Amino acid sequence: MHISNSQFWKRILKRCNGLKLVNLQTYLKPYRINLFIARNRAQITILQEDKLLEVEMLHPKMDNLCWLHKVAPGFPINGSKITIIHEPVHFYGTLLEMCKFAKRRITFASLYLGTGKLESELVQTIEHAILSSNGNIKARFLLDYMRGSRGVQNSRKMLEPLLKGKYAHCSEVFLYHTPKLRGLLKVIMPDRFNEVIGLQHMKLYMIDDTLIISGANLSNDYFTNRQDRYFIIEDAKELCDFYDDLVKRVGEFSFVLQSDGSTKLNSTLSSHPCEGPKQEFSEEAAHRIKTLFQNEIQKRIELNKQKEALDADTWIFPLVQMGQLNILHDSEVTLKLLQSASLGARLKLATGYFNLTSDYISAVLKHCQATCDLLTAHPTANGFFSAKGIASSIPAAYTKIEESFYKTCERLGQQERVTLWEFIKPGWTYHAKGLWYYLPGQQRPCLTLVGSPNFGYRSVNRDLETQIAIVTKNEKLQMALQEEQERLFMYAKLVTKRTFSQEDRIPPAWIRTTIVLFRYFF
């Protein structure tokens, strides 16, 4: 369903359950934001007061991006401080090297931490860094409770050494437990499948004032042959402070790992995620996130008046999605980006698991006017391809969803404007997700989304997610974004009608009959 600008602002306000985005008039009108200010004028609806404000823009073709300042905190940065790396091994090496020389903080948020040799070396490096700093480094981890507790040797066991010894007080491990997994459902659902109910999925890696944001988890595959995206943002203290605070806020309504391997619910929380009233927990947790977000927007308004902010050539906007807590922020912003892409623009969208929500499908096929290329994993590059049991059929289920989308494109006459591609690279799996936005007539993207969301039902409704929107006029950064996109699509194979008639691409009958249920959990 297409929504107008005024409907968009009201929808975000409603879905954020009372989150008020402050009036930007005192911020935008007297000051020229280099990224968005230009000779032309545009009328922009103010969310809080639902009235128009005149704002000058940087580039007439970027008018439809300035609204990001009104729905998320904006962090100015020089584009030269952003580095894109391409290989999992470089991601791991960067984490290791930066942890080795950390001075103040190491804050990691991930689905889980693996249990192999590489993961052990990472934990040992962090432990040694804390020791070398004489306890001046604060190490903080946020993982998913169920995924991090799976098996005898698990993430919790891996991190226990940090909670013992002379500097045990320097480390803390938070384990988020979804309020939706409780009672009989929690008892009967196998460990391998309980994560479909909902989990902590954010991927944030902060060392001092550097943020590495990615879709990659902390495990062997993601360090070796599982393709993802990795952005290193240096000298970004304020951005790191915000995300560090976000991790701490989620930690406030999570379990805390103890030195003996047990867990205790954070003492700052008055309600229990899986034993107390679900609504009470969800409302209390959501309030803490919304308060943080609102306060950050207010703070950015004042700080962004300074000359350093006005001279920035790049802006970063954090987007948060916590559907199980009724915080639908990232999905609304993403939907607006898709719907507002104009004729002549180009969008490149990637997801490790192709399962677009009905809103996203409608936006791409019915309202978006841009040329769209969608990249996802070929079945052999799907992370579940070599799985055992029922999980081995998951790639076939995604094939069925792809086929349904392809047929919808044909039925609506959009198969020329919207093209589907599959990543296939021998020996590799594919996990990259995000978006590259090209203005009409431009050869390089000026905006990208990078982070944890997959644009599917899980990301929107079940998991804790975050990604950042990077808007830039820095030519070198735009070139780096273009190179990143080309490297991923270099291994892409075009999807055609014949793709789905190949013998190895025809899903079993039981998949075809259960796909409606499947798509709401994966």
Regions found by a protein language model. Give the residues of each.
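Structural motif
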Residues: 111, 350-353
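Short, solvent-exposed amphipathic alpha-helical segments in soluble enzyme
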Residues: 362-367, 465
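HKD-type phospholipase D/PLD-like phosphodiesterase module
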Residues: 41-43, 47-50, 56, 60-101, ...
